[in-house]
Amino acid sequence: MSGEQHDFSHLDRAGRAAAGVARSPRLAVMLTIGISVVLAWFLLGAMAIRGAESSPVGAPGDMLLKNLPSLPLPGFLDRFFALCLAPAPLAGPAGMQAPALVLMWFLMAVATMLPSAAPLIRTYCEIADTARIKGEPAVHPLVLVAGYLATWLGASVGFSALTLAVYAFAGSGRMLDPAIDIAGAAALLVAGLYQFSGLKQACLDKCRNPFSVLFANWSAKPGRIFRLGLEQGVWCLGCCWALMLVMFAVGAMNVFWMALIGLFTLIEKQTTGRVASRVAGTILLVWAAGLLLVSA
């Protein structure tokens, strides 16, 4: 029965579409990723609108966000937004605020970094499809995606802890506000210098050439593929972690800068050479120098 081919002609249109998705792991994975990215952007956008309602106009796009309608949302999302947008660390329910900040940063990672992992995931799907055509076992691509996202979930813990540290030591008015003076300049300086480093280039090369890595580490064991996803996530983190520091200089809930960083990482991983990295690094260093001069 499993070897028979079915055209699902007795199902309605929706049923045939669902059967087609279920039969094609590649399509199912791409749909899952697409929905996840859209959902992450929706939640971040809704949170940014809520944050703009109670903040003075200052950051780019604040006026636009203030004029956008605030959508009615379920109560659990309102509570999640309130924990993330609290002006300072909460003394009472602080135990819930820390996981909320981790989830906020993880949503940023899904929104900005998962699209740039599309070549990796697409390449794995192609290899898996070829293996199945030959009758060989292949681990579902979502196992690879889960490993990749697990790396960014771990990184989100670090970024959320850094959020609390920056608020405590950088003198920001509110917890997610831009880091001012030396703290903001330091974030830009580190991000800018890293764009010229050999480690950045080594990680970028791994992200740009997923086929050789996947082919050399191919396995039919889910644990091995999950670990492969973790490793590829580490390479991506090594490539992009410094860019995430820019969010501390512009404000963690600045969705316009989120989109710009996501677009840059997508372009950087699809191109060759170091031009994009060096241009970005130069801009960040000039920006850091300007911020230092202004705050002096």
Q: What residues fall within each predicted segment?
A:
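Functional transmembrane helices that embed catalytic/metal-coordinating motifs
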Residues: 99-126, 146-155, 193-218, 222-269
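Histidine-/acidic- and/or cysteine-rich, low-complexity loops and terminal segments associated
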Residues: 2-106, 130-133, 171-176, 201-216, ...
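Acidic, low-complexity central loop/insert segments
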Residues: 134-165
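Membrane-interface elements of multi-pass transporters and channels
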Residues: 50, 118-121, 165-173, 201-204, ...
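Hydrophobic alpha-helical transmembrane segments and immediately flanking/interface helices
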Residues: 166-187, 245-273
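Interfacial helix-loop-helix junctions of multi-pass membrane proteins
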Residues: 164, 241-251, 278, 285-294
